Regions:
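Bacterial N-terminal signal peptides
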Residues: 8-20
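Glycoside hydrolase catalytic-domain groove-lining segments
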Residues: 262-315, 339-348, 385, 390
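Aromatic/acidic polysaccharide-binding cleft in carbohydrate-active enzymes
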Residues: 304-422
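Conserved, mostly hydrophobic/aromatic
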Residues: 55, 120, 169, 187, ...
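Acidic, Ser/Thr/Pro-rich beta/coil linker or hinge segments at domain junctions
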Residues: 434-487
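Carbohydrate-binding surface patches
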Residues: 396-452, 493-500
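N-terminal carbohydrate-binding accessory modules
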Residues: 27-84, 216-219
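Substrate-binding cleft and catalytic face of glycoside hydrolase catalytic domains
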Residues: 80-276, 287
Length: 504
């Protein structure tokens, strides 16, 4: 929650932000691009829900039992507005939920399921339940996926037994936690069935069969539970999903899909257009919003249950200060177009490619091995302090927000492509119409402030840091640049600044 400040802004004040060159006598990086942005505090505002910090992905279900996972989760909970966690493989054999006796009769075991979900709830977080992958005893094929833990992307050998598994799973959760609690969860059927996480043929038709059985089972457990899909990769299948559920009268309480900044235009839009990483997510979100709006279910909630700047391991992307302006820009682009967006992932307690060998390798997580916050984590912490109302939505490189106490929080960013450094911008914030003198607090994230990756490289990029080095990395990770009682600052590229303005 945003800390309340004493006093409030005087009604009818104007806020003017000018981006201009600073005096040549100041010790600063080379002068950057001069730009002027005028912000009017009297402009109308609209609600600005923090849709980007309510759901986060993580490594597969069984990893949530580890102390390191739960430590990272507590770190997230203390710094953001995280409400839900989504992970793969709650039905994987290592969770032990399903087996059959010699006569083929199902046996269910919810021991690890209970420990997994208890661990989330004990830390103030609810499950976003992705129902995957297929238990070996129920799978039509035992050919595994290439992931290190070898999940089975197979259809069930018996769809009736699949439906019974989902029903008994959901019914157990209702019995254990109560329907008042579980009705606030989300149940999502499978993961990315349009690519290699689903081997049914034809893929879409067999997925819809899987979905229909699961959705009926969820509603049979209790009609108040929420179920949706298709959890597709590459923003795919949304119109088909809505059309199918309408025709088949299959329950559908939300639609979900995924996008990554380095997805290809041909996969998202069916074109050869070269779309920059900074724009891909926003473009895909707009596409799906338009599809839902023009469908038979125009008011369906849209949940992006995975997104990130990269689906590959790119150290100068997900581990770097690049993520600050990338995230802020995507918040700007996607505002008003989605119910929630789930960043993949909050932690590098993650083993899809195997056991982590080094803390920085381009992992998806906001928190590196050893509970070391990355620059992207710091960006989420800063953006958490934005207000709950927004004005001036036409601005390209800033978000102007107003808080309930009347203060302002402004995110300003300077984007540069991954692995590059752009021109530094000089920024001056001016406030007019105040009774008295405004006070400023400015926080800046860039390659030299708040980037544990930079500190790790300065150590010589140790593959296995010592305990002392990990402690040093944790200290450095939180060392963003902080400025008080000044309205001027230099913003490197890549860089993200949060400017907080309040009465003196």
């Amino acid at each position: 929650m945003t800390r309340s400040w004493v006093g409030s802004l005087i009604a009818g004040t104007c806020l003017l932000l000018e981006v201009a060159s600073l005096a040549s006598s100041q010790q600063a990086p080379a002068p950057g691009v001069a730009e002027e942005i005028v912000l009017d505090a009297q402009a109308s505002t609209r609600p600005f829900p923090h849709y980007w910090e309510q759901v986060f992905g993580s490594g597969r279900a069984i990893l949530s039992l580890r102390d390191s996972y739960r430590r990272d989760l507590r770190t997230m909970k203390a710094a953001t507005d995280i409400h839900y966690v989504r992970f793969h493989a709650i039905f994987d054999d290592e969770v032990g939920v399903y087996s059959e006796d010699a006569q083929g009769r199902p046996t269910y075991n919810w021991s690890y399921v209970d420990q997994i979900y208890d661990g989330l709830l004990d830390n103030g977080v609810r499950p976003f339940v992705e129902m995957s992958f297929m238990p070996r005893a129920l799978a039509a094929s035992d050919k595994p996926h290439a992931f290190w833990y070898h999940p089975l992307p197979s259809p069930p050998a018996n769809y009736g037994k699949w439906e019974d598994l989902v029903y008994n799973f959901a019914r157990h959760l209702v019995d254990r936690y109560g329907v008042t609690e579980v009705s606030q969860w989300y149940f999502e059927v499978w993961n990315e069935p349009n690519i290699d996480f689903w081997t049914g043929q034809p893929a879409q038709a067999t997925y819809f069969e899987l979905y229909d059985h699961a959705a009926r089972a969820i509603k049979r457990a209790d009609p108040r539970l929420r179920v949706g899909g298709p959890a597709s990769a590459q923003a795919a299948w949304i119109p088909d999903m809505i059309a199918h559920s309408t025709q088949a009268k299959a329950p559908l309480d939300f639609v979900s899909t995924h996008v990554y900044g380095n997805d290809l235009s041909k996969d998202i839009f069916g074109t050869d257009e070269n779309i920059d990483r900074s724009e891909m997510v926003g473009r895909a979100v707009q596409k799906v919003a338009n599809q839902v709006k023009s469908s038979a279910r125009p008011d369906l909630p849209i949940i992006w249950s995975e997104y990130n700047a990269s689906y590959k391991n790119e150290i100068d992307v997900t581990d770097a200060a690049f993520m600050g302006p990338w995230l802020a820009n995507n918040i700007r682009l996607c505002d008003g177009l989605t119910t929630a967006m789930s960043y993949w992932t909050f932690s590098d307690v993650f083993e899809e490619q195997g056991v982590i060998k080094t803390p920085f390798y381009g992992g998806y997580g906001l928190i590196a091995e050893g509970n070391v916050p990355k620059a992207a984590f710091n960006a989420f912490v800063m953006l958490h302090r934005l207000g709950d109302r927004r004005s001036q939505p036409d601005l390209r490189n800033s978000l102007v927000t107003k808080r309930s106490d009347g203060s302002f929080a402004i995110a300003i960013w300077n984007y540069a492509a991954e692995g590059t450094a752009g021109a530094t911008r000089s920024v001056q914030v001016k406030v007019t119409g105040w009774q008295g003198t405004p006070r400023y607090h400015i926080e800046i994230l860039d390659n030299d402030h708040g980037s544990a990756l930079t500190a790790w490289r300065a150590m010589g990029s140790p593959e296995s840091p010592t305990r002392e080095q990990y402690e040093q990395l944790r200290r450095t990770a939180s060392a963003t640049q902080k400025l008080d009682d000044t309205s001027s600052f230099m913003l490197p590229a890549p860089g993200l600044a949060l400017v907080e303005v309040r009465p003196h």
